Curated annotation (Swiss-Prot):
GO terms for cellular component: apical plasma membrane; cytoplasm; nucleus; protein kinase complex. Its EC number is 2.7.11.1. The gene is sgk-1. One of its GO terms (molecular function) is phosphatidylinositol-3,4,5-trisphosphate binding. Keywords: ATP-binding, Cell membrane, Cytoplasm, Developmental protein, Kinase, Magnesium, Membrane, Metal-binding, Nucleotide-binding, Nucleus, Phosphoprotein, Serine/threonine-protein kinase, Stress response, Transferase. One of its GO terms (biological process) is intracellular signal transduction. Disruption phenotype: A mild developmental delay, extended generation time, an extension of life span, defective egg-laying and decreased body size, but increased lipid storage. RNAi-mediated knockdown abolishes expression of the vitellogenin vit-3. Expressed in late embryos just before hatching. At postembryonic stages, expressed in sensory and motor neurons and in the intestine. Highly expressed in the intestine and head and tail neurons. The lineage of its organism: Eukaryota, Metazoa, Ecdysozoa, Nematoda, Chromadorea. The active site is at residue 259. Disulfide bonds: none annotated. This is Serine/threonine-protein kinase sgk-1. Residues 393-463 form the AGC-kinase C-terminal domain. Its cofactor is Mg(2+).
Length: 463
């Protein structure tokens, strides 16, 4: 065979999957060489992997199951790389979660796993993972209904992260187990998208769940908007383009976000926006499939959600319109302190725009805030409808995705531990490290409600 791409000469764990592309001398024969740990290398065609994955479809999350398709004029090398990553991600998932399946072991040429209960852990935690005691707890940087977010430092690497700690008891009482597991699933499949927060570790003990995430200390978009009252069109366009890219990516993965608001958009130290908090995401939303759960934040709810009608991905485009409106004018459209009055306005009141904005901006907001979802911008071609709108004509989308554009505003950030852009309401909350990393509880805990929650970031590759 001919050339090999991405050949990594490094130490690997016994259950770590590596995969390389091998292209024949005729440039047509392509196989994918897969190896688990330091075991034997197996070479199979893409079709062989795809056939097997199809037989094991029930074991594979829908968010990663769809095979990559070649785009028009896409280079072969990029297409092979996307296929390689797809094979790698699914293989690692099967090895981590389904080794008790005889078919999986046979396909990957693996021996039967040890049945000793003392050696069983949750999913990917069979690998070397993090624990609560691996971190120093520095500052509180956020809080929610189920827990708080902390700035933490990994004791060994000294790297700064954001750690979200949730109470299992509160999650169960509120019947939110599915939402938390959906958040975990979305996070592990973000593939380091430039505008989606990345998960580095997740783990648990008897009482708590832990998400270890990118630390973004440029502040919430909400706090910057509150301080400045409103943004210019050009600055709003930059942020709206990033949000649209993130939503479009999630939609490609058949995920509806459902909770877009300025509080869930964080700035990094370069001035780029990153979407966070995936607790209300809905998975497995292929094509025009609908759902009907009433959820979201009142100011940004689409009419069909308020009316408890079936809704689809276009609710996210309504939210984008609401956030863009708020960036331009300072408040969400149809805003009222009285929620019932606001809901009535969202459903019945015509959209009114001031005349101090450009025609393309006015047309975009109007298109996104169509009360009839079948007429809403994004209904036909999803992200492409938004990307191709005249308002975004000045945006170089490739440079934006590669983070090569200069942000219109760069927050003042001294270093990774700087909390000057974080609300004092959070920073002043005292931390009790002993309650966050209790010594008396098992590091890992068999808990069927949160089975397969544990994760460690090892082979995250941008596709």
């Amino acid at each position: 065979m001919g050339s090999m791409y991405y050949n990594e000469s490094r130490m690997v764990r016994k259950d770590e999957v590596t995969c390389n592309v091998i292209i024949g001398d005729d440039k047509k024969t392509v196989v994918y060489a897969l190896r688990i740990g330091n075991g034997p290398i197996m070479q199979k065609t893409f079709e062989e992997y795809e056939r097997f994955f199809t037989t094991e479809k029930d074991m594979i999350p829908a968010t990663i199951f769809t095979a990559p398709k070649k785009k028009f004029l896409q280079a072969d090398s990029k297409f092979y790389e996307k296929r390689r990553v797809w094979i790698l991600v699914i293989s690692q998932h099967l090895v981590d979660n389904n080794l008790r399946s005889e078919d999986v072991r046979r396909f990957f040429h693996l021996e039967s796993p040890d049945d000793d209960e003392n050696n069983v852990d949750l999913g990917p935690s069979e690998r070397k993972t993090a624990t609560a005691n691996d971190f120093d707890y520095l500052t509180t940087i956020g809080k929610g209904s189920f827990g708080r977010v902390y700035q933490v430092r990994h004791k060994e690497t000294k790297k700064i992260y954001a750690m979200k700690i949730l109470s299992k008891e509160h999650i169960r009482k509120k019947n939110e187990v599915k939402h938390v597991m959906a958040e975990r699933n979305v996070l592990i499949n973000n593939f380091k998208h430039p505008f989606l927060v990345s998960l580095h570790f997740s783990f648990q003990n008897k009482e708590k769940l832990y998400f270890v995430l990118d630390h973004l200390n440029g502040g919430e978009l909400f706090s910057h908007l509150q301080r400045e009252k409103h943004f210019s069109e050009s600055r709003s366009r930059f942020y709206a383009a990033e949000i649209a890219c993130a939503l479009g990516y999630l939609h490609e993965k058949n995920i509806i976000y459902r909770d877009l608001k300025p509080e869930n958009l964080l700035l990094d130290d370069k001035g780029y926006l990153v979407l966070t908090d995936f607790g209300l995401c809905k998975e497995d939303m292929q094509g025009s499939k609908t759902t009907s759960t009433f959820c979201g934040t009142p100011e940004y709810l689409a009419p069909e959600i308020i009316l408890k009608k079936p809704y689809d991905k276009t609710v996210d485009w309504w939210c984008l319109g609401s956030v863009l409106y708020e960036m331009i004018f300072g408040l969400p459209p149809f805003y009222s302190k009285d929620h019932n009055e606001m809901y009535d306005k969202i459903i019945n009141q015509p959209l009114r725009l001031k005349h101090n904005i450009s025609v393309p901006c006015s047309e975009l907001i109007t298109g996104l805030l169509q009360k009839d979802r079948s007429k809403r911008l994004g209904h036909r071609n999803d992200f492409r409808d938004i990307r191709d709108h005249p308002f975004f004509l000045p945006v170089d989308w490739d440079k934006l995705l590669n983070r090569e554009l200069k942000a219109p505003f760069i927050p003042k950030v001294k270093n990774a531990m700087d909390t000057s852009n974080i609300s004092k309401e959070f920073v002043e909350i005292q931390i009790d490290p002993s309650s966050l990393a209790p010594q008396q509880l098992a590091v890992t805990h068999r808990d069927h409600d949160f089975e397969n929650f544990t994760f460690v970031d090892t082979n995250r590759v941008l596709v």
